[in-house]
Regions:
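Long, compositionally biased, intrinsically disordered regions
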Residues: 23-330
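Alpha-helical hydrophobic helix detector
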Residues: 13-25
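Glycine-centered recognition micro-motifs in short, flexible terminal segments and loops
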Residues: 1-16
Length: 330
């Protein structure tokens, strides 16, 4: 090849080189763009899964609490360690829930770290750790969530009366209320409580519902105690320093050291206003009636809150609870 040929070949090479380099750059950019798009898709999927778990945790936890409560209600046998048993069942259900993501190539893990009381007695606090991985992406989040005992598509029953009355005839469910028949009177009699007969055929609320009359003195400061009657008719519960928390109710404890709740246990109506102000019976607050430690069950004086034809509806309240609910002190 003569010099002219070499020059032409060299010129052609330098003409082709920029095009080749440009092609390499375009290929590299295309590859990076595809990788970026895939990373973005994976990132959105990972965050979406984490959000899904965070949203569904309270619903699954509420189902666990409901089922554990029904277990105690139906058997009358308390849980030995409610926090541990609820946590274990919660973990089992979350493991099952997380496994559905395996077919999508996503590793999902939710560890239930702790189940315990919340600052709000109408909630249960759950601490958990969520891990979601896909490819090289990994997302971790620690959560502290409150599971409501009152808000949701299904009620959560109070298990305590069914534990206390087991072996004394048993409490039964009558629509939205607990009917005691003779079981509560038998329970009180077995403990040597005076005037236990006042609770023959008594009733109390079945499901946990938070009372809207706050502050609680609003119960008693209306004409004819209308708010108190509405509270009783609706079966509301109230915050209480003395009443048992829900997790301890699952263990059959009438009182506990935690900030808890209380409700009224309603004596059967009488056919005459026979109760004079000097008569007494166990105070109609559940933690008083179900406090079987020492002298925890104390008496209250009757208060008539409603009458209709020949039926008279009364509560027995001690002065401490009268003051709490705005009812005249005896």
């Amino acid at each position: 090849m003569n010099n002219k040929g070499y020059v032409m070949s060299l010129a052609s090479f330098f003409l082709i080189l920029p095009a080749f380099l440009l092609l390499m750059v375009l290929v590299d950019l295309s590859t990076n763009e595809a990788q970026t798009q895939e990373a973005n898709l994976n990132s959105h999927e990972v965050l979406g899964v984490a959000t899904d778990l965070e949203t569904n945790l309270p619903f699954i936890g509420r189902e666990v609490i409901r089922d554990k409560s029904l277990e105690v209600v139906n058997s009358g046998i308390p849980l030995s360690n409610s926090r541990k048993e609820v946590k274990e069942e919660f973990q089992n259900r979350m493991d099952k829930y997380c496994s559905k993501y395996a077919d999508k190539g996503v590793f999902v893990e939710c560890i239930i770290l702790k189940v315990d009381n919340s600052y709000d007695p109408f909630c249960v606090e759950v601490k958990s750790k969520i891990t979601v991985e896909k490819g090289t992406l990994k997302h971790n989040v620690n959560l502290t969530q409150n599971i409501s005992l009152t808000n949701g598509s299904f009620p959560i029953y109070d298990p305590l009366p069914f534990v206390k009355c087991r072996g004394h005839g048993g409490a039964t469910i009558n629509e939205e209320r607990i009917s005691y028949g003779s079981s509560l009177a038998n329970y009180l009699q077995s403990r040597g409580i005076k005037n236990y007969e006042a609770y023959e055929n008594a009733t109390s609320p079945l499901s946990i519902k938070k009372c809207p009359y706050d502050p609680y003195i609003l119960h008693g400061n209306t004409n004819e105690l209308v708010n108190l009657k509405n509270c009783i008719d609706n079966g509301f519960y109230h915050e209480s320093n003395d009443g048992a928390c829900f997790l301890c109710r699952l263990e059959g404890k009438g009182i506990c050291s935690h900030y808890g709740m209380e409700t009224f246990i309603i004596p059967a109506p009488t056919i005459s206003p026979c109760m004079n102000n000097s008569s007494t019976a166990p105070s109609s607050v559940d933690h008083v009636i179900f406090n079987d430690t020492g002298h925890g069950t104390y008496s209250g004086h009757p208060i008539l809150y409603f009458s209709s034809e020949n039926h008279y509806f009364s509560l027995y309240l001690d002065n401490s609870h009268r003051q709490k609910y705005g009812v005249p002190i005896f």
